[in-house]
């Protein structure tokens, strides 16, 4: 038997993990083992919302050392993280300023300013990226306007996965899939857009040309002295998750479900027409020159905050209580900016219901019901938008990531969307990370080859839509009302 041992470092906005993958070439089987799992979260520092990158680096090194202590020879390492955030370095590679998180309020008002000064359509034609108030484009503008004293000291700007790869190898890299999330990469050249960079106030010299997944950045020297390749995987966690989505044919859509929900489809060409702009569709970079045509949805961040505020530890019990409640009594727009980082999520949800003359969710289960129903309805709207954009309906939706373990939300999604839902794999970002490593090691041919491995080894569960469910009837009433309004217009 020929084995490959690859390590994936997968950092999300709420947790991180170091996972060991063992790939057996002859039987094309892939097994994962969790080596180290650790918390991640927002911190308050000097008036900013920040990430504790030192703690994250220590956790990464601890996980890697654990693998080496077992006597396992690692063939390669890959790192993926969330998008848009960055670390600034001086000429000596030391940090400049704080690693500010995207949920910080420093970018307030800057997206509207950019649209006014540059033109919304021009920004979109250049980048193909959706307008989110925390995109790197606006973060850099906030930095250069609000902290000009830092500018003379900055030599490099590294996105989060590139920063941690640099800390392991001493080599700098700017990986393409994550770079596209910045709204600073030109969709035609795959390089930094000079006009957008100029508006941000950043110096182009801070960045190197983005590289596509699959190159070796450098080497990490393990405690035993071995030099282990660190591979530039699809370092945006959603890009990795999509690689591991067992998409079957052109009519398959995906939903990467976690702190954020990202719904979309793969395409060989981007969509930057007026319809895509009006729907705020993004065209993020994927592996093998594919585009991830998708839309960001606030996701389980709302639930995570409610769990924290209400000190709820038994999630299965909460879901069971939630399932017993009637559907669609409390509906909010999860994508409203008010939910990005409110002082109290529970109060913000209640206020949104109060302002729209709805009943007020008071209990833990009612708040969860509000979140799940609202997410499922938004999923249905977004899936409809995506189908209209490409001119073809979808036949199935693959839900991947940690959120796919929520069977209630999976069924609500199937019912609201009226589509077959296939849930799994759970550790999609980790698997996609491993997939690029195996391709770099010449163990697999391409993404489609890797997806065949995932399909045969991952635990997948199918949810069939129930047209008689409460949420399905609610969606039907909404569509009927919309059609009536359109006919009367």
Swiss-Prot record:
Chain residues that bind ATP: 13-17, 259, 304, 402
Organism: Escherichia coli O157:H7
PANTHER family to which the protein is assigned, alphabetical: L-RHAMNULOKINASE (PTHR10196:SF93), SUGAR KINASE (PTHR10196)
Pathway: Carbohydrate degradation; L-rhamnose degradation; glycerone phosphate from L-rhamnose: step 2/3
Top-level taxon in the UniProt lineage: Bacteria
Active-site residue numbers: 237 (proton acceptor)
InterPro entries on file: ATPase_NBD, FGGY_C, FGGY_N, Rhamnulokinase
Protein's UniProt keywords contain Magnesium: yes
GO term, biological process aspect, one: glycerol metabolic process
A GO MF term: glycerol kinase activity
Cystine connections: 68-222, 353-370, 413-417
Record keyword ATP-binding present: yes
Record's catalysed reaction(s): L-rhamnulose + ATP = L-rhamnulose 1-phosphate + ADP + H(+)
Cofactor names: Mg(2+)
A GO cellular-component term linked to this record: cytosol
Assigned protein family: Belongs to the rhamnulokinase family.
Chain sites annotated for binding substrate: 83, 236-238, 296
Keywords in alphabetical order: ATP-binding, Disulfide bond, Kinase, Magnesium, Nucleotide-binding, Rhamnose metabolism, Transferase
Pfam families for the chain: FGGY_C, FGGY_N
EC number: 2.7.1.5
Gene name, Swiss-Prot/TrEMBL: rhaB
Function: Involved in the catabolism of L-rhamnose (6-deoxy-L-mannose). Catalyzes the transfer of the gamma-phosphate group from ATP to the 1-hydroxyl group of L-rhamnulose to yield L-rhamnulose 1-phosphate.
Stated name of the protein: Rhamnulokinase
């Amino acid at each position: 038997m020929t084995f490959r041992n690859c390590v994936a470092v997968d950092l999300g906005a709420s947790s991180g993990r170091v996972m060991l993958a063992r790939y057996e070439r002859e039987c094309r089987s892939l097994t994962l083992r969790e080596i180290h799992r650790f918390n991640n979260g927002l911190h308050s520092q000097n008036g900013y919302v920040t990430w504790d990158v030192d703690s994250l680096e220590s956790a990464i090194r601890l996980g890697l050392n654990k693998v080496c202590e077992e006597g396992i020879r690692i063939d390669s390492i890959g790192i993926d993280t969330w998008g848009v955030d960055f670390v600034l370095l001086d000429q000596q590679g030391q940090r400049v300023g704080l690693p500010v998180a995207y949920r910080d309020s420093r970018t307030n008002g800057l997206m509207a300013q950019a649209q006014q000064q540059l033109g919304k359509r021009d920004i979109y034609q250049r980048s193909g990226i959706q307008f989110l108030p925390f995109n790197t484009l606006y973060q850099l503008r906030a930095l250069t306007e609000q902290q000009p004293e830092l500018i003379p000291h900055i030599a490099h700007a590294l996105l989060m996965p590139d920063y941690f790869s640099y800390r392991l190898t001493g080599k700098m890299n700017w990986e393409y899939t994550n770079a596209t999330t910045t709204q600073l990469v030109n969709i035609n050249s795959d390089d930094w857009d000079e006009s957008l960079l100029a508006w941000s106030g950043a110096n182009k010299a801070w960045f190197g040309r983005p590289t596509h997944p699959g190159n070796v950045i450098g080497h990490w020297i393990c405690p035993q002295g071995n030099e282990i390749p660190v591979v530039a995987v699809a370092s945006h966690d959603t890009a990795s998750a999509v690689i591991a989505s067992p998409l079957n044919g052109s009519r398959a859509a995906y939903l990467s479900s976690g702190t954020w929900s990202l719904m979309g489809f793969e395409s060989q060409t981007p969509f930057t027409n007026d319809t895509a702009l009006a729907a705020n569709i993004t065209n993020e970079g994927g592996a093998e020159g594919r585009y991830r045509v998708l839309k960001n949805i606030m996701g389980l961040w709302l639930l995570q905050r409610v769990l924290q505020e209400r000190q709820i530890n038994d999630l299965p019990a909460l879901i069971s209580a939630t399932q017993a409640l009637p559907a669609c009594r409390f509906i909010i727009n999860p994508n409203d900016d008010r939910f990005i980082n409110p002082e109290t999520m529970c109060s913000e949800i209640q206020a949104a219901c109060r302002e729209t003359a709805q009943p007020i969710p008071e209990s833990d289960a009612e708040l969860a019901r509000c979140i799940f129903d609202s997410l499922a309805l938004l999923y249905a709207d977004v899936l409809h938008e995506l189908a209209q954009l490409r001119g073809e309906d979808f036949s199935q939706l693959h839900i991947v990531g940690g959120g796919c373990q929520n069977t209630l939300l999976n069924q609500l999604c199937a019912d609201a969307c009226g589509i077959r839902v296939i849930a799994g794999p759970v550790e999609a970002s980790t698997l996609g990370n491993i997939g690029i490593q195996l391709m770099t090691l010449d163990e697999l041919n391409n993404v489609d080859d890797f997806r065949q491995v995932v399909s045969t080894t991952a635990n997948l569960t199918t949810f069939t839509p129930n047209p008689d469910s409460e949420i399905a009837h609610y969606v039907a009433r909404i569509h009927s009302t919309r059609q009536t309004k359109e006919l009367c217009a």
